[in-house]
């Protein structure tokens, strides 16, 4: 029997929210707001929260709390929620990341996870004095990073000799509580990203897309993973606008786009499209994104979780039917909308899942 679809939310630990727009956002990046949000999300049925990693300002993100630190703070404020801390190879070494995350796992009863971000913002790397590798080299480094994490977390006297990282007879103690290790997430949509996920990652995040577009990615990565004898779960980005009527929801979307900051949207679009264009296939997560799509950082409008609770629940169950395991959601007004989602959307999703299971059992 298939598992219920899981839900995660983007932690707003970076100022400016998740849309590049001057629309009012009743969301704050400060720690008090985020602690309360984590508690609301936990009560509302969310299993995961994903913290963001940024080092420099840009596209409205003038202030940024560091991801591992805020992840620990949110875990301390909750009891069941898992928090996924975003980490960049380069600024982090696998030795440091393994030690930090193992310690947090011990302190929180096994509730930390990691999102290994290969990097998309060239200016940020230059600003902090980190080398900017070519596209596929970034993913090669990330794969070594993940292999090193797994080795450190699961072996004593770990040795590893890669092109980017080396370990000689290293033993980490204490190791994480989670067995075999904390869950490892990654994102991307290039061939290099999918290939890496099919070999080493537990979870693969993809940008928002149509059902058909998501299915093509799911089928491709699952086939690659099967060929490698590996299992990987799929998470999809979605910007959720749930309102009592579809007209209200569509009006909110229209206002977000109408109040978009053109300079910031175009600057962000140029940065991410250049990063993707450096891949051998000349594409990436945002290759086909329009101006309207780019107003939301991760193409979240494309997933179309916009409408009434019933409409959104039906679309979520349709995504589950094509192999999606998790919805990574963003909101305009996080606290109130996460609570609304938990009260009005999530119960409908569970009802529809139960109906589908019953129908399969009868058939």
Swiss-Prot record:
It catalyses: dimethyl sulfone + FMNH2 + O2 = methanesulfinate + FMN + formaldehyde + H2O + 2 H(+). It is an enzyme of class 1 (oxidoreductase). Transmembrane segments: none annotated. Keywords: Flavoprotein, FMN, Monooxygenase, Oxidoreductase. Pfam families: Bac_luciferase. Induction: Transcriptionally activated by SfnR. Disruption phenotype: Cells lacking this gene are unable to grow on dimethyl sulfide (DMS), dimethylsulfone (DMSO2) and diethyl sulphone (DESO2). It comes from the Bacteria. Its EC number is 1.14.14.35. This is FMNH(2)-dependent dimethylsulfone monooxygenase. It comes from Pseudomonas putida (Arthrobacter siderocapsulatus). The gene is sfnG.
């Amino acid at each position: 029997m298939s598992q219920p679809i899981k839900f995660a939310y983007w932690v707003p630990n970076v100022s400016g929210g998740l849309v590049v727009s001057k629309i009012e956002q009743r969301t704050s990046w400060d720690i008090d707001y985020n602690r309360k949000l984590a508690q609301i999300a936990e009560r509302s049925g969310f299993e995961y929260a994903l913290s963001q990693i940024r080092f420099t300002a840009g596209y409205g993100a003038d202030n940024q709390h560091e991801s591992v630190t805020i992840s620990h703070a949110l875990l301390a404020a909750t009891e069941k929620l898992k928090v996924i801390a975003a980490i960049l190879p380069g600024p982090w070494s696998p030795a440091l990341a393994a030690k930090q995350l193992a310690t947090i796992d011990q302190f929180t009863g096994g509730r930390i996870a990691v999102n290994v971000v290969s990097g998309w913002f060239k200016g940020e790397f230059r600003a902090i004095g980190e080398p900017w590798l070519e596209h596929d080299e970034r993913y090669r480094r990330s794969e070594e990073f993940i292999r090193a994490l797994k080795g450190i977390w699961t072996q004593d006297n770990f040795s590893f000799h890669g092109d980017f990282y080396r370990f000689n007879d290293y033993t980490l103690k204490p190791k994480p509580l989670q067995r075999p290790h904390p869950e490892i997430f990654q994102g991307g949509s290039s061939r290099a990203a999918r290939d890496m996920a099919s070999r080493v990652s537990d979870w693969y995040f993809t940008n928002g897309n149509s059902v058909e577009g998501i299915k093509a990615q799911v089928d491709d990565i699952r086939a690659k993973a099967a060929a490698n004898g590996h299992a990987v779960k799929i998470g999809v980005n979605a910007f959720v606008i749930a309102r009592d009527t579809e007209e209200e929801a569509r009006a909110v979307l229209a206002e977000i786009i109408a109040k978009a900051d053109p300079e910031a949207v175009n600057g962000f679009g140029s940065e991410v499209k250049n990063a993707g264009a450096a891949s051998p296939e000349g594409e990436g997560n945002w290759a086909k994104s329009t101006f309207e799509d780019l107003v939301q950082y991760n193409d979240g409008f494309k997933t179309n979780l916009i409408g009434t609770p019933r409409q959104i629940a039906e679309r979520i169950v349709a995504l589950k039917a094509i192999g999606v395991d998790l919805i990574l959601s963003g909101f305009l007004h996080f606290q109130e909308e996460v609570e609304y989602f938990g009260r009005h959307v999530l119960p409908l999703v569970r009802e529809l899942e139960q109906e589908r299971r019953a129908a399969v059992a009868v058939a």
